[in-house]
Curated annotation (Swiss-Prot):
Gene Ontology MF: a single term: methyl-CpG binding
Domain comment, as recorded: The methyl-CpG-binding domain (MBD) functions both in binding to methylated DNA and in protein interactions.
Domain named MBD: residues: 4-74
SUPFAM superfamilies: DNA-binding domain
Protein's name in the database: Methyl-CpG-binding domain-containing protein 10
C-alpha cells in the first residue's frame, strides 16, 4: 500500500524493474485511468501510446505484450443479464397464420384478377417450354463438349505414343552410334599402342647398335694398345672386360623388351667369337701394362678437376669484388646526389628570400607614395 497525494494505490504484479499501480475510482475525482505503470527511470505512464513511445525511445525493456492494463479480476455480471442469457425463447415449429383481410372488391376487380391469373398461367407455361428447350440445348452442348474432349484425349494419347516411339528410336540410334564410336576409339587406341610398341622396338634396336659399335671401338683400341705394348696381353683380362660390356648390353635389352632375346643370343655368340679371335691374336702380340695406363688417366682427370675448381673459385672471388665495387660506386653516387639536392634546395630558399625582400620593398614604396599623395591632397584642400 502506497499513499501518494492522499490517493490510495495498490501495487500489482508487473514486468521486471517496472511497477504497476492500481488507483480505485472515487466519486468526484478527476482521475480517469485506474492503472499506471512506473518505468525504471521513475516516469509514470498512463496510456498505451505513451508506453509505445517510451519503449521505442528506451530499448532493452520488456515487450509491450507483457504489459496488461487490467487488474486481473474477472468482472462481475449482473443477475439480470445472466437471467436473460438463461431464458431461451422457444422456436415455433409452424409459422403463425396471418389474419385474412376482408375484401370489399367489386365484380370488375374480380374480373381483372382472373385475367391477371390467366396471363400469369400462360407466362408460366411459356417459361416451362423455354426451360425445357434450354435444358435440351445444354444437354446437347454437354454431349458435344464430352465428344470433343474424348477426341482431344485420344489425339493426346496418339501423340504421346508417337513421341515415346520416336524417343525409343532416337535412343537406340544413339546407343548404336555410341557403340560405333566406342569401337573406333578402341581401334585407335590399339593403333596408338602398336605405334608406341614399334617406336620402343626401334629405340631398343638403336641402343643395341650403339652398344655394338662401342664394343667394336673398345676392342680395336685394346688391340692397338696390345700391339704397342712390350709384353703379350693376358687373354683372361681382355675377356673379362669384354664380358662386362656384353653384360651391360644384355641388361639394356632385357629391360626394353623380352621379344629381342634371339637377337641378344646372336650378338652374344658374335661377341664370344670376336673375343676368342682377339684373345688368340693378343696372346701372340704380347701383354700391355693396362694398370699403368688406367692410373695415368686417373691422374690426368684429377689434375683437370683441380684446375677447374681453382678457376671456379677465382671467378667467384672476381665476381664478389666486382659486386663490392659496384655497391661502393652506387653509395658514392647517392651521396653526391643528396649533396647536389641539398645545394639546390639552399639556392632555391635564398632565391625565395630575395624575392620576398623585393616584394616587401615594393609594397613599402607604394605605401610611402600613397601617403605622400594623401598629404599633398590634404595640403591642397587646406590652401583652398
Amino acid at each position: 500500500m502506497e499513499n501518494t497525494d492522499e490517493l490510495v494505490s495498490i501495487e500489482l504484479p508487473a514486468p521486471a524493474s517496472w511497477k504497476k499501480l492500481f488507483y480505485p475510482k472515487r466519486a468526484g475525482t478527476p482521475r480517469k485511468t485506474e492503472i499506471v505503470f512506473v518505468a525504471p527511470t521513475g516516469e509514470e505512464i498512463s496510456s498505451r501510446k505513451q508506453l509505445e513511445q517510451y519503449l521505442k525511445a528506451h530499448p532493452g525493456n520488456p515487450v509491450i505484450s507483457e504489459f496488461e492494463w487490467t487488474t486481473g479480476e474477472t468482472p462481475r455480471r449482473s443477475s439480470r443479464i445472466s437471467q436473460k442469457v438463461k431464458a431461451t425463447t422457444p422456436t415455433p415449429d409452424k409459422e403463425p397464420l396471418l389474419k385474412k383481410r376482408r375484401s370489399s372488391l367489386t365484380k370488375k376487380d374480380n374480373k381483372e384478377a382472373a385475367e391477371k391469373n390467366e396471363e400469369a398461367a400462360v407466362k408460366e407455361n411459356m417459361d416451362v417450354d423455354k426451360d425445357g428447350k434450354t435444358e435440351n440445348a445444354e444437354a446437347e452442348k454437354e454431349k458435344e463438349k464430352e465428344g470433343v474432349t474424348e477426341i482431344a484425349e485420344a489425339e493426346k494419347e496418339n501423340n504421346e505414343g508417337e513421341k515415346t516411339e520416336a524417343e525409343k528410336v532416337n535412343k537406340e540410334g544413339e546407343k548404336t552410334e555410341a557403340g560405333k564410336e566406342g569401337q573406333t576409339e578402341i581401334a585407335e587406341a590399339e593403333k596408338e599402342k602398336e605405334g608406341e610398341k614399334a617406336e620402343a622396338e626401334n629405340k631398343e634396336a638403336e641402343v643395341v647398335r650403339d652398344k655394338k659399335e662401342s664394343m667394336e671401338v673398345d676392342t680395336s683400341e685394346l688391340e692397338k694398345k696390345a700391339g704397342s705394348g712390350e709384353g703379350a696381353e693376358e687373354p683372361s683380362k681382355v675377356e673379362g672386360l669384354k664380358d662386362t660390356e656384353m653384360k651391360e648390353a644384355q641388361e639394356v635389352v632385357t629391360e626394353a623388351d623380352v621379344e629381342k632375346k634371339p637377337a641378344e643370343e646372336k650378338t652374344e655368340n658374335k661377341g664370344s667369337v670376336t673375343t676368342e679371335a682377339n684373345g688368340e691374336q693378343n696372346v701372340t702380340l704380347g701383354e700391355p701394362n693396362l694398370d699403368a695406363d688406367a692410373e695415368a688417366d686417373k691422374g690426368k682427370e684429377s689434375k683437370e678437376y683441380d684446375e677447374k675448381t681453382t678457376e671456379a673459385e677465382a671467378n667467384k672471388e672476381n665476381d664478389t669484388q666486382e659486386s663490392d665495387e659496384k655497391k661502393t660506386e652506387a653509395a658514392a653516387n647517392k651521396e653526391n646526389e643528396t649533396q647536389e639536392s641539398d645545394v639546390k634546395k639552399t639556392e632555391a630558399a635564398v632565391a625565395e628570400e630575395k624575392s620576398n625582400d623585393m616584394k616587401a620593398e615594393d609594397t613599402n614604396r607604394s605605401l610611402e607614395a600613397n601617403q605622400v599623395q594623401q598629404q599633398q591632397g590634404a595640403a591642397a584642400s587646406v590652401s583652398c
